[in-house]
Amino acid sequence: MWFKQISFYPLNKDKLPELEVLADKLAQSEFAHCQGLDWFSEGFATPVSFSPELVFPADYTWLVALKKEEKVLPAGVIRDILDEKVLEIQNNEARNVGRKEKQELKEQITDDLLPRAFTRSSRTQAIFDTRHGYLLVNNAASAKAENILTKLREALGGLEAALPNTKQSPSSLMTSWLLQGHCEGGFELDSDCELKGVGDVVPVVKVSKQDLTADEVVQHVKNGKTVTQLGLVWREQIAFILTQDFTLKRIQYLDVLQEEAESNGDDAASLAFASQILMTEAISTMLEELVSYLGGWQE
C-alpha cells in the first residue's frame, strides 16, 4: 500500500470528522456497480482486501478509497453496427438515411449495447493524516486528486482542504538547490531533473541518471532555465521527484522503511497497519520540512 505518487492537501485539523462519522458518511456514498444505461458509477469502496470496512484506520491515519467503474463500448463497434443498419434500410426500403436518422439509430444502438458492455474499474486511495493535518492522495494527476477531494466534500457535507500554497514556489527552491549544487537539511540531490526555458516555443531539457552538479547541467540554470522537476533523496528513507506544482512522483521507499514495516507485520492486516503509519509519518514529516524551506504557508 506504499503510495508511488502523491498529491496532498493541508487540512484544518480542528474541523476533521470523527472516525465513526467519516465511516458512516462514506457508507451513504458507497460504490455500486453500473446499472442499465449508466456509462459509469463512482463511490467509496473498501480500501483493503482483508476488511469490508470503508475506512482502514491505523492509529492517526485513516485510509479510504474511491472506486470508479466505466462501461467500455468501443466507437468502432457502434460504427460497424450502424453501417449495417443503414445498409439494411437502403436495401429494404430503397432510400437514403439522413443525418438525423443516423444519429437516432446510433443512440438506439448505444442503448441496446450498454447493459451488456464490459466494464473497467479504477481506484484512488487517500489517507487522512489527522496528526499533521494532511490529506495524501495516491495520484499526482490533479484531475484524479481533485475528484476524490470533491467526493469526500460531498459525502461529508464539506471538508476544509486547500491546495498547497507556500511563500516560495517549489520551482524557485529547486532551481536554487540545483544552482548551488546541494540541498538543505535532510535533502540530497538525486540524478534526475527537468528544466524549462521561456519563449514562444518553450525549450525543455530532461536529465536522467546524471550527476546534477555537473557543469553541463548547472549551465542550463545559468542560461535562464528554471527547474520544474527535481529528483531528491530525503534522510536516506525516500527517493522521489518533486514537481513545480508540489506533487511527488516516482516515490521509492528505501530499505530502512520497508524492513521496519515487515518487522512489525505478521499477517496482511498488521503489515498494512505498520506500513500505513510508517509511510504517512515519513511523507508528512518530509513535507513539513520541505514547507519550511519554502518559507512556510501563505496566509
Label every PLM stretch briefly.
Residues 1-299:
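Intrinsically disordered, low-complexity, charge-rich terminal extensions
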